[in-house]
Amino acid sequence: MPSQKFENLLNLALETSMEERDKSLELNVGYEREDNTWELIVKYHGDLRQGMSSFFALPQRRLLQIEELIAGYAIMTVPESFVDALALVEEIEYIEKPKRLFFETLQGKLASCIVPGSQLGTTLRGQGVLVAVIDSGIAWRNQDFRNTDGTSRILYLWDQTLQAGQIRERAVESGLFTGENSIDYAPPDGFYSGVEFNQAQINAALNASSEIEGNLLVPSLDTSGHGTAVAGIAAGNGGTSGDVYAGVAPESELIIVKLGTPRANSFPRTTELMRALTYIVRKSLELRRPVAINLSFGNTYGSHNGTSLLERFIDNVSEIGRNVICVGSGNEGASGGHTGGSVGITSNTTAGTSTGMASGASNTLVELIVGNYESGLNVQLWKDYVDRYRIRLISPAGESFTVDTDKAGKQTYVLEQTRILLYNGEPAPYLTSQEIYFDFLPLENRSYINSGVWTFELEGIKTITGNYTFYLPSETVRSEQTRFVRPTPDVTLTIPSTASKVITVGAYHAALEAYADFSGRGYLYQDRLGGRIEGSFIKPDLAAPGVGIIAPTRAGTYEPVTGTSFATPFVTGAAALLMQWGIVDGNDQYLYGEKVKAYLRKGANPIRGEREYPNERVGYGALCVSASLPG
């Protein structure tokens, strides 16, 4: 039976067979078939372990893990047979399953007012500030991340994808690590996964007699090069280029988290991001140093209004210690994965009471093109809970069903050769809007869902706001042809850039001085689910160069990269410079968090073609660090 303590997606997953979950892009995220366990995000109060004490007496207790994070959040790994009982634990307030994260990949320093020879190019170089990059790892041998004496600028590297036991076995087999040379490979304190390397271990690997020996000492690789490029833009020293391609904060020291899991062929999860943020903030507090944190990835699942556990967790993290968290707005602006509008407002209605006649409301058709060879697809429909709709889904061949909107929970339908799992959600303790979730799966004898134009017909029965919005999965996991016929680019920023207290970064083309159309758009003084947006809740906050940015590669060279992934580290590096000026240099001990955001907003430059500021494309304008410094 569905629990109101569980999010909609978790309820649907638990009510769906393993065979059907395997066909879904989303429902099995967090489930481990080998152990029959779920990884879950938990919001709790009080003593969680005490509240869970009875579970540790059960036969399957060996599979139970609790990782307490910060601010009343935890990640739990539990046998599937335990999950329903979690709803009875008084200390647990709410539970969500993980979501997948996608890297946002598709002459910035001068455009961002960081001029060589100025104060920003000489005295402000990130000294005394930590730059933390949560990404695909780093090419730790690269000269861009080493001091002039050859030692590493990386203080800590946590590779979440490595397994300590396997690395230890290889080390023993190699014959290199005996006696005083042995290394105790282990996760960071308080965590169960991955391997942590410190600066001394990285330096030992750099000084090894051969590259092979060094790679045995620190077997962490950035296989995509994404994290290396991001770290280079934020904090590389341009060592391979003679400082020509130095990053924004080239004398900062680094904390790197390679996001992921030992599972093969899998995307990173939101749970791994939450672990990474907890780890970095704890290190910052331990080292008593300010930290600028860079996140260059996101996903499209959620209401996009800052209410998910991940978004609220990040807002809580931003208030611990002296940190700034910078997040890219994503590359979904022109992907066709979002649409929205209004079915109109019915007449003779009083909020929460009578139904009335629909004079202002009308039937609305939302058409979705599904490309060939889609093995599965999910669609989110978000609406105001007070509004009542009649919703009909029509297949490409004209078959249809009408959603039973009076029945909460799971519903199952079949149109043509496609099974549709539907979950009619309810409000949650942290969410006033309603989600209706559709998961399109091929029938047992097919590999793909039906292609063609699928139509959602919306009819307002009693509508107070009439607003609706649809989201598809990230363009990374759907075919190029799959998109809405009439997409809307607004509110296409990805989660977690929707968190209130992060600095959300869009991208612009510095050479053309123009907004980059792929950059995820936000919202500004407009109606959205749950009411009007507060004036202070504006996304994105500003934009940075994100097209053709020269960045270091894992091979030790440089190449151009494009995407909000590579706009974000400009702002992360800028935050490090402001915190150096304020905290390290003693000009303002309180220059972190929202104060850095305010200064960067105030110093932003106009962008060609943008008439009003702030706006939903570039926020307050283009990053300009020199104008953001006080005085």
Regions found by a protein language model. Give the residues of each.
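Hydrolase catalytic cores
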Residues: 231-234, 242, 255-262, 281-291, ...
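C-terminal subdomain of the subtilisin-like protease fold in secreted/lumenal serine endopeptidases
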Residues: 30, 286, 290-299, 306, ...
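Autoinhibitory N-terminal propeptides
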Residues: 1-72, 79-121, 130
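Extracellular S/T/G-rich loop segment that most often corresponds to the catalytic His/Ser-adjacent loop
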Residues: 160, 191, 200-202, 320, ...
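Short acidic, glycine-rich surface-loop motifs adjacent to enzyme active sites
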Residues: 98, 154, 257-259, 277-305, ...
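Edge beta-strands of jelly-roll/beta-sandwich modules across compartments, strongly enriched
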Residues: 436, 463-475
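Catalytic cores of secreted or luminal carbohydrate-active enzymes
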Residues: 293, 310-352, 619-625
